[in-house]
Amino acid sequence: MRPASALLLVLLLAPAVTAQRPAPAAAAADSWRQFRGTPSLTGVSASTPPSSLKVLWTYDLGDVIDSSAAIADGVVFVGGGNGDLVALDLASGKLRWKYTTGNLIGESSPAVGTDAVYIGDLGGIFHAVNVRDGSRLWTFRTGSEIKSSPVIVNDIVLVGSYDAHLYGLDAKTGALRWKVMTNGMVHATPAVQNGVAFIAGCDSILRAIRVTDGKEVYQIDSGAYTGASPLIDNNRAYFGTFNNEVLAFDLERRRRLWRYAPEDRQFPFYSSAALANGRVVLGGRDKYIHALDMATGKPAWTFATRARVDSSPVIAGGRVYVGSSDGRLYVLDMESGKKIAEFDAGAGLTASPAIASGRVVIGSQDGILYALG
């Protein structure tokens, strides 16, 4: 190739190279320390479970499981509807310890730090529990029920409450560092990127809040009541709303990038999204799992289940793992959306999968926690 031709080829290829976006953050292969796996709530695991899932063990919590499991250091942590937070051996399912909150536990899912595991209950109490023996370290009382899941950012733990506040607490002592009042219940889990927490709220506002001091940096009017948690990746936010739509926002320009709203099926999106390979994947109450182009919002594929999908998908090993209220955990090919396998739990799956060390852990509406691999 002549020098001039080679230079021209380099110039033509350069924009394509620089336009490539870094891959979304993924949870480590051996851990899933919080709801959605990472503080930015990407829903991606570096682990690769087998495509054909078999039951390795089960554990009966005795009540409905809406809480999604966390996995750290070979231990599974999950909350049950009866108010118990349990720690189980990942390999065997054997009970390590049980902590009783004294209230019911709903959708709040545990977050695991170095010394403590954190969870909220429906009585509005936020708990820090010794990760090794299940003893109480401290509690913090909010003004209403907690369905939001905690996120640990250095020495601060974040959690939302139905009292309309997002709280920043000292992770070691439970002391209040700050709180931010919104105009509605804080149901969703905050997503964190570069020291800023983002909450998509029941007041139709996407708020950016500095983690160190709780200062609101800016807000964007999403125009819709939101129960799903936002996914943040490379200064973009993705989330579904109760206005039967999925939205993407450019956080630098603070404007909407695209809106996806199926014309033939008007149902809310309660599931939180996962992102990999240029696609945003989430479940809908229209009984479908949707995969959208991250740049345009155009559908890449949909997959029909037999009931609404409130469970949030996890992407691992080129596959999508997601539960449905029809009682099945589906394994789908990430590129095509074709079903690879399914596991029938026999009861609705509204909790989300946790994936680590080649295992998939999910709880069902009849109180059974499954470890599959």
Task: Locate the predicted segments by residue.
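Positively charged n-region of N-terminal signal peptides that target proteins for export
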Residues: 1-4
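Bacterial N-terminal signal peptides
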Residues: 6-16
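Extracytoplasmic beta-rich repeat domains
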Residues: 21, 27-29, 39, 57-70, ...
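A short helix->beta-strand "capping" segment at the edge of beta-propeller domains
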Residues: 44-62
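Beta-propeller domains
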Residues: 80-90
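Short loop/turn segments that connect beta-strands within beta-propeller blades
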Residues: 89-93, 130-134, 170-174, 210-214, ...
